[in-house]
Amino acid sequence: MRILGIDPGLARVGYGVIDTSGGQQRMLDCGIIRTEPGYSEGDRMVVIASDLRQLIRAWRPELAAVEKFFFYRSSTTISVVQARGVVMMTLARFKVPVVEFPPMQIKLALAGFGHAEKDEVLEAVMRELNLTDPPRPDDAADALAVALTGWFQR
C-alpha cells in the first residue's frame, strides 16, 4: 500500500510517501511544500493545493494520513487550520481515503507513549523505514511519522 503522510502548515506542509508492499515499510519520497511569507494567504493556499496535486499525481497514494490540528492559542492557528482544509479538499478531489491522527496518537504509535520527545519519534521513523540518515527537514520527518501511523493503525 502506498501512503501519503501530511503534516499541515501554512509556511511549510511536510509530506512523506511510504510503500508497505512486501511486508516492509520503505520511504519513497519526503519533503515540504513551501509557501512564501510575502504572498497573500489565498495565494499560499493555491500553492499548497497545486503542489499537493502534483504529489498525488506522481505517487498515486492509496491512503493519506493527516495530522489532526492540535488547538492552542497562537496567532497562526486560523491560517494553519485553513491550510489543512485545503489539504483535505485536495485529497477529497482525488478520492484519496483519509485517516487523521492527533500528535499524541502518532507519538504513541511510533515511540510507544503519547508524550514522546521529537527525537524519540524520529529514531522510530528511521528504524521503521531502515534509514541511515534522518529525513529533513523536520516537517518531512513528521509527515513520515504520520504515514507510518496510518499504516500501523489501519
UniProtKB/Swiss-Prot annotation:
<dbReference type="Pfam" id="PF02075">
    <property type="entry name" value="RuvC"/>
</dbReference>
<keyword id="KW-0238">DNA-binding</keyword>
<comment type="function">
    <text>The RuvA-RuvB-RuvC complex processes Holliday junction (HJ) DNA during genetic recombination and DNA repair. Endonuclease that resolves HJ intermediates. Cleaves cruciform DNA by making single-stranded nicks across the HJ at symmetrical positions within the homologous arms, yielding a 5'-phosphate and a 3'-hydroxyl group; requires a central core of homology in the junction. The consensus cleavage sequence is 5'-(A/T)TT(C/G)-3'. Cleavage occurs on the 3'-side of the TT dinucleotide at the point of strand exchange.</text>
</comment>
<keyword id="KW-0378">Hydrolase</keyword>
<comment type="similarity">
    <text>Belongs to the RuvC family.</text>
</comment>
<keyword id="KW-0540">Nuclease</keyword>
<dbReference type="GO" id="GO:0000287">
    <property type="term" value="F:magnesium ion binding"/>
</dbReference>
<feature type="binding site">
    <location>
        <position position="139"/>
    </location>
    <ligand>
        <name>Mg(2+) 1</name>
    </ligand>
</feature>
<feature type="binding site">
    <location>
        <position position="7"/>
    </location>
    <ligand>
        <name>Mg(2+) 1</name>
    </ligand>
</feature>
<keyword id="KW-0963">Cytoplasm</keyword>
<dbReference type="InterPro" id="IPR020563">
    <property type="entry name" value="X-over_junc_endoDNase_Mg_BS"/>
</dbReference>
<dbReference type="InterPro" id="IPR036397">
    <property type="entry name" value="RNaseH_sf"/>
</dbReference>
<comment type="subunit">
    <text>Homodimer which binds Holliday junction (HJ) DNA. The HJ becomes 2-fold symmetrical on binding to RuvC with unstacked arms; it has a different conformation from HJ DNA in complex with RuvA. In the full resolvosome a probable DNA-RuvA(4)-RuvB(12)-RuvC(2) complex forms which resolves the HJ.</text>
</comment>
<feature type="binding site">
    <location>
        <position position="67"/>
    </location>
    <ligand>
        <name>Mg(2+) 2</name>
    </ligand>
</feature>
<dbReference type="InterPro" id="IPR012337">
    <property type="entry name" value="RNaseH-like_sf"/>
</dbReference>
<feature type="active site">
    <location>
        <position position="7"/>
    </location>
</feature>
<protein>
    <recommendedName>
        <fullName>Crossover junction endodeoxyribonuclease RuvC</fullName>
        <ecNumber>3.1.21.10</ecNumber>
    </recommendedName>
</protein>
<dbReference type="GO" id="GO:0006281">
    <property type="term" value="P:DNA repair"/>
</dbReference>
<keyword id="KW-0233">DNA recombination</keyword>
<dbReference type="InterPro" id="IPR002176">
    <property type="entry name" value="X-over_junc_endoDNase_RuvC"/>
</dbReference>
<feature type="active site">
    <location>
        <position position="139"/>
    </location>
</feature>
<dbReference type="GO" id="GO:0006310">
    <property type="term" value="P:DNA recombination"/>
</dbReference>
<keyword id="KW-0227">DNA damage</keyword>
<dbReference type="GO" id="GO:0005737">
    <property type="term" value="C:cytoplasm"/>
</dbReference>
<keyword id="KW-0255">Endonuclease</keyword>
<keyword id="KW-0460">Magnesium</keyword>
<dbReference type="GO" id="GO:0048476">
    <property type="term" value="C:Holliday junction resolvase complex"/>
</dbReference>
<dbReference type="GO" id="GO:0003677">
    <property type="term" value="F:DNA binding"/>
</dbReference>
<keyword id="KW-0234">DNA repair</keyword>
<keyword id="KW-0479">Metal-binding</keyword>
<feature type="active site">
    <location>
        <position position="67"/>
    </location>
</feature>
<dbReference type="GO" id="GO:0008821">
    <property type="term" value="F:crossover junction DNA endonuclease activity"/>
</dbReference>
